[in-house]
């Protein structure tokens, strides 16, 4: 997995979001300002800044007049920096985090399903094309999902040692919230589970009364007479001791009250620790918390607005949420199964997951979820895995931006644990089937190396056909400029080249001498025409004219198509 991710990180040029995150990370460390990329909390970008600290990055102008996207391009291409080195430096901490999350997957699944279950879960996580693809990039999706997953694992561990693990769960939850606000819907579930874990721990520590078949602990030795018979204790003494003992009902009520108070304290304490972590992250960027609410920022009102107002987080965090709500009010274009559309499709994300998840993994996810539900002793563990997966998926399905399975990147973590429980099914054919499905996942993942971002499973034609069904970060996120430059230099030297590119990279930096076909009449566009597949998916009328007389002859990274016209 490490080899696959490092190879991917070295080969890919900037995706659409990465320059913004890198520039913001540098502004954090150089200027201690929160003004860029406020729609996302700072922690993920501070993690990237840890990698950038090993590079000699030039000083950014505090008065730079451009947008955050322009600042990202300026940092990578206009400031004398090496974009390959900067990107790799920012991506390496994310890669290390992704590998560490794999160990958490192993530990969680081993706790629930034993060593074999842990290995099954680790194998599914390690071969997940989505995890490899997005864990190789300087983005926020995998860090946020992994930190939240770690929080749920620690809450699970808290069932046995609450005073050690529940505070750590609060730290992990706060870190997740300080990376992406989209983790907020999981907070009620986690604090309730913290209370449940404390309840279980307190109940397990209470002494259990002896049953009729069990003698009391340390029964008193009876004195014997010279004839060997026991002297019975005086009846009056026994009655007095019984009268002095508290009633059984009072003892039970006292124990229950203690458990309730401890559970409530665990829930509140875990939440307060998470809140403190978010504040500490913002203070780490700017100890003075200098922030001005942008003009014209709409307030949603209603329950959503009330929830934002009541969040115990810095104003910059709450305003970032309002910016996200503003973005959700827009109408976006989407592309699914070969058809473009405008607006929102509630089933887009489940359909995209079915396309981009290995078939064996889908089968094991489903089997694992059913196993956790139908095996009684696993139902408690299911509370720590399945509800959070369902809640986050349902919330993601309501979003207006149909841009990729990265919005559900938490599923390969949580459902890997569920899949590991199939190891507890002691049926010969089930064990053989599980082994074959894991092997199928591994083969499918290895076959797509190193093109993990545009992966799709065999039922939908494999990686080469992903662009026929999906777009944007599912297949073409602007990541293949370096591969395109090499392809043009090797296979099409000296030919007239035209380029329609979607991304944040600068083609000229990579030696791509291509003209813009939109600047001349259609009948003057002849030669090699390179088009990002995301542009083809949502082709404008002008682009459709260009494609009418164009013949596809080649592809680059399964994200760009080369035509001859």
Regions found by a protein language model. Give the residues of each.
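Hydrophobic, aromatic-rich transmembrane alpha-helices
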Residues: 352, 357-379
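Membrane-interface transmembrane helices that cradle and orient dolichyl/undecaprenyl
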Residues: 110, 151-166, 198-201
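Short hydrophobic alpha-helices at membrane interfaces in multi-pass membrane enzymes
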Residues: 158-174, 255-261, 388-389
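Transmembrane alpha-helix segments characteristic
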Residues: 121, 365-367, 376-397, 546-550
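C-terminal luminal/periplasmic domains and tails of membrane-associated envelope-modifying transferases
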Residues: 227, 249, 253, 337, ...
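Signature aromatic-anchored transmembrane alpha helix within multi-pass, membrane-resident enzymes
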Residues: 188, 268-271, 373, 377-378, ...
